[in-house]
Amino acid sequence: MSRPRKRGRDIHGVFLLDKPQGMSSNDILQKVKRIYQANKAGHTGALDPLATGMLPICLGEATKFSQFLLDADKRYQVIAKLGERTDTSDAEGQVVETRSVNVTEQKILDSLPHFRGDIMQVPTMFSALKHKGKPLYEYARAGIVVEREARPISIFELNFISYEAPYLTLEVHCSKGTYIRTLVDDLGEYLGCGAHVSMLRRTAVSDYPADKMLTWEQLQQFAQDEDLAALDARLLPVDSAVSKLPVLSLSEEQTKAVGFGQRVKFDNLQQLQGQVRLFSPQNVFLGVAEIGKDNVIRPSRMVNL
């Protein structure tokens, strides 16, 4: 007779992990899910094993809103090593080209405006983007180069921090879909010396505060203590994933209607557009709705708590 499968917990919220170097985002996700004994978990955009920093992990009903964090702005601190290009554009790859570094701080400062604003970027071959149903990195590992189209990205900030040749430290605030490895590789080519990522740390996702992150060691200590209550207290609310959306408070009657997936008409939505967060009269988060024509809202992602 097969042993009955142990049921996990219906736990809901967003956990902020300070991801350690050397672990994949998917490995981290499965370990966090196991530690929380959660029925459902999902991360909000992978970090390379080399990278450290903020990795929001959605548990339970929060997974319905993970796409909002995938689409959110990100901030990074990156150390680029000038003079070397690698096949992965980071320190984990093989060096494919070495050049002398005759780059001054002023030359770097003069180059940065070229990469700010709305630009086009060709994704790295070592990425999870798919071609004919297979991730690009699988082609890359087989020595196959696939033609990739340049994609629009936005670099909101690209700030110089320090330069001690051959190491250049920058801070980046960017849109979704930005590959920092590609940005560094492109910058190295623009400077004429080549470059790759030596260190990468994600410092922010959306508006999540860095002081709410837990280190891997702290998480393991909670797990060893079997203190689920303390772990649960570290979770941020489900609606934190959509905190940038405007709030729309509903009446009791409207709350019941959206609970059944029905559209609700308002007299005046005060020029609200796009998507809104819905709350009940008791200030309970209900989900996200789309604002349509004639002041009608349509429930799109509703929580089931």
From Swiss-Prot:
InterPro entries listed in its UniProt record: PsdUridine_synth_cat_dom_sf, PsdUridine_synth_N, PUA-like_sf, PUA_sf, tRNA_psdUridine_synth_TruB, tRNA_sdUridine_synth_fam1_C, TruB_C
Alphabetized UniProt keyword annotations: Isomerase, tRNA processing
Catalytic activity: uridine(55) in tRNA = pseudouridine(55) in tRNA
Transmembrane segments: none
Record-linked SUPFAM superfamilies: Pseudouridine synthase, PUA domain-like
UniProt cross-references to Pfam families, sorted A to Z: TruB-C_2, TruB_C_2, TruB_N
CDD domains tied to this protein: PseudoU_synth_EcTruB, PUA_TruB_bacterial
Molecular-function GO term, any one: tRNA pseudouridine(55) synthase activity
GO BP annotations listed: mRNA pseudouridine synthesis; tRNA pseudouridine synthesis
Superkingdom assignment: Bacteria
Gene3D superfamilies: Pseudouridine synthase, PUA domain
Active site: residue positions: D48
EC number: 5.4.99.25
Function in brief: Responsible for synthesis of pseudouridine from uracil-55 in the psi GC loop of transfer RNAs.
Family recorded in the similarity comment: Belongs to the pseudouridine synthase TruB family. Type 1 subfamily.
Protein name according to UniProt: tRNA pseudouridine synthase B
